[in-house]
Amino acid sequence: MKITKLEKKKRLYLMELDGQQTSYITEDTIVRFMLSRDKVISKEELTEIQDFAQFSYGKNLALYHLSFKARTEKEVREYLKKYDIDKNIVSQVIANLKEDKWINDGQYAYAIINTNQLSGDKGPYVLTQKLAQKGISKSTIEENLKEFDFSEVAQRVANKLLKKYEGKLPSRALQDKIIQNLTNKGFSYSDAKIAFDDLDSQVDQETTQELIFKELDKQYSKYARKYEGYELKQRLTQVLARKGYDFSDIASALREYL
């Protein structure tokens, strides 16, 4: 078979054989096989050329995808699937990129965890979920998590939450709110509790009383329409307790309020 045309078409080249059969190949393929117009090639050589062309095309696509930011093996595989590249070729591309250090799931996991350590707010459970979704193996995730102490991250998040809620919630509700937020962000309950206990979060009696009276102003008009006397007192006690106030503080406030 003779190459009768070799014409550039955007990123690929159109190779025509005997004026009929056509294939799209990469520039790397032309260089590797020293292809030119009028060159004669065998069927075996054509198969080899086509296989390498697809490999080269897949690798170029993957490198383009990786040029924007680091990706995991799973992300690159999914990207290449969109271009209908043969599975075996995809595996060859992935192996080649891993060998050349373009893909390294371990380094990817370490970088994500390290960035979170410096400026993020996620605990190990949420990070594990996110990295697993990227296709990183459980063993790789666990191996990298062991390199980090999350107590500083938990403390940083707890301090931010304290600034947000202090003076707005009673002591018990403040503790519940901060610990709940920390566990939602992926910290264990024990780590969240330690972070809260290390806070300087004393809500003084005067602040607690102010908060109770503000809440009573809102709730009294609502319940006074339906209840009175002992029943009203019970309803107000229940609603204040649900909001995190201690029964002793509630009883003291109700004696003054009612």
UniProtKB/Swiss-Prot annotation:
It holds the Pfam family RecX_HTH2. It is found in: Cytoplasm. Keywords: Cytoplasm. GO terms for biological process: regulation of DNA repair. Its main location: cytoplasm. This is Regulatory protein RecX. Belongs to the RecX family. HAMAP family: RecX.
